Amino acid sequence: MKLRYSRVNKMLVAEVFDINKNKVSEIELNDAVFGAEVNDAVIYDVVRMQMASRRFGTAATKGRSDVSGGGKKPWRQKGTGRARSGTSRSPIWRGGGIVFGPVPRDYKYNVPKKVRKNALRSVLSLKYQGQKLVVLKDFPLDEIKTKKFKEVVDRFGLKKALFVTEERNEFLEKSSRNIAGIKMVRSEGLNVYDVLNHEHLVIIEPAVKKLEGALKS
């Protein structure tokens, strides 16, 4: 998509298209949100946090108290000439428990809200700078129709794209569900990993101002 930068008022300008790929207007983008300096470090921190949150952490081993059996003392304490032993499930025995093995755990952690906002501004700016940002005037769809949605995707030549809407739209969400490489999110659910994981970012115009309002400060 053709994008240009206006140096008169120091505002970023993007062209706005309808679903037939006709230019209908232009929109000024907030420089602090779509023209920010790209900070690779905060992007890395936030993506790492998101990936950690997706880990299940279900790996587990049995300690000496978890292994079945071993309740009977193998032999008497004294008089056999062998080392004393209280259970056959000791970690030093074959078939015994595991010492310091993995246990179920939660890998989730948080980074400061300010860092998350900074990372989101960085990836939005990255899409704008790389001319991978598409702004649609609207996406009129009054029924669940995957075919119609796919026609728009093909018209813009989108292979892997993230669509951002201002609010919940059942028709758009369900129509895009079975199209490979396409994902639909609401503006409040936009995240760094999804933006990076898709080649194009397609924003429905009303969602632009909502994003700017949430991220400009």
Swiss-Prot record:
Question: A GO term (biological process) for this protein?
Answer: translation
Q: Name one Pfam family in it.
A: Ribosomal_L4
- GO CC terms on record? ribonucleoprotein complex; ribosome
Q: Does the keyword rRNA-binding apply?
A: yes
Role summary: One of the primary rRNA binding proteins, this protein initially binds near the 5'-end of the 23S rRNA. It is important during the early stages of 50S assembly. It makes multiple contacts with different domains of the 23S rRNA in the assembled 50S subunit and ribosome. Forms part of the polypeptide exit tunnel.
Per its UniProt record, what PANTHER family does this chain match?
A: 50S RIBOSOMAL PROTEIN L4, LARGE RIBOSOMAL SUBUNIT PROTEIN UL4M
This protein's assembly is summarised as: Part of the 50S ribosomal subunit.
Per its UniProt record, what NCBIfam families does this chain match? Answer: rplD_bact
What is the name listed in the Swiss-Prot or TrEMBL entry for this protein? Answer: Large ribosomal subunit protein uL4
Q: What's the encoding gene here? A: rplD
